[in-house]
């Protein structure tokens, strides 16, 4: 019987884990791209998952830095440029008034700004140049998700995201991820799930099954949209998706128990649907 904290510690040290619930807090992070890559290297993680910050994302942050006095609306875009209208909002007596300030053009290739009001364009360009080399909490969160998806195969614990199940086989990878998150000013939260508890085993099974079911259904729904204009490469990719899903089901079969047969049925249905589509396209139907 566990009656003291020491008993609990001894029990925890000897228990076998199913996996961990993982979440993180990156809200106050602001770090350069160079420092981010150095932190990845120091934690023995890949630096190939850190794409450049899109100009429009940096532009949105730059505009936010200008304060609330400007209303900014995208007018249009083409292959080379994005066009925005800046409107000044001011309170006069009982009402707000709005005055068009100018039209701003952002180059998708260079990030350079042109504006019908030069001083406004210069102010935005200065803020944009400050934001481009920085990576914020949202960028690091996306990076953590990409690393987890690529290395560990995470499963959402709740539909809204933000909390994920990572199996015990990837605990060493989580150690590296925890090290990286701390180096950049964030915090990785890890909650171990012991094996052998009814609620824990059941929750792990249903979490994995739900994620795999959603994945297979997503592939099936995309197959339903195939038609005569569908490229052969798209059909091949759909077949690859089904093969990957089948491999994942097999890989996690030890945790799935009775849920395995339901997922197998979904895979069979998706495969049959793809065969029907391929035959129909070949026949010109």
Region locations from a protein language model:
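Terminal interaction module
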Residues: 30-50, 57-64, 134-138, 142, ...
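Short, flexible turn/loop "capping" segments at secondary-structure junctions
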Residues: 14-16, 156-157
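Basic, amphipathic alpha-helix used for nucleic-acid engagement in HTH/winged-helix/SANT-Myb modules
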Residues: 104-123, 201, 205, 224-225
């Amino acid at each position: 019987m566990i009656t003291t904290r020491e008993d609990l510690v001894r029990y925890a040290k000897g228990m076998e884990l199913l996996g961990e619930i993982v979440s993180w807090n990156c809200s106050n992070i602001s770090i350069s791209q160079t420092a981010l890559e150095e932190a990845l290297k120091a934690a023995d993680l890949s630096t190939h998952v850190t794409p450049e910050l899109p100009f429009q994302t940096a532009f949105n942050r730059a505009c936010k830095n200008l304060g609330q006095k400007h209303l900014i609306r995208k007018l249009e875009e083409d292959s080379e440029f994005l066009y925005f209208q800046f409107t000044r909002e001011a309170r006069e007596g009982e009402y707000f008034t709005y005055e068009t300030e100018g039209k701003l053009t952002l180059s998708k290739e260079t990030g350079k700004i042109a504006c019908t009001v030069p001083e406004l364009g210069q102010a935005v360009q200065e803020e944009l140049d400050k934001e481009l080399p920085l990576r914020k909490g949202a960028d690091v969160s996306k990076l953590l998700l990409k690393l987890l998806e690529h290395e560990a195969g995470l499963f959402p614990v709740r539909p809204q995201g933000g909390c994920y199940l990572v199996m015990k086989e990837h605990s060493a990878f989580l150690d590296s991820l925890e090290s990286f998150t701390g180096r950049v000013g964030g915090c990785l939260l890890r909650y171990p799930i012991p094996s052998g508890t009814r609620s824990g085993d059941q929750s792990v099974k249903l979490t994995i099954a739900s994620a795999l079911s959603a994945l297979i259904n997503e592939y099936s729904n995309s197959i339903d949209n195939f038609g005569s204009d569908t490229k052969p490469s798209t059909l091949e990719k759909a077949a690859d998706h089904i093969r990957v899903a089948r491999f994942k089901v097999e890989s996690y079969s030890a945790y799935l128990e009775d849920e395995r047969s339901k997922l197998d049925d979904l895979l069979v249905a998706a495969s049959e649907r793809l065969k029907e589509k391929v035959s129909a396209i070949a026949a010109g139907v």
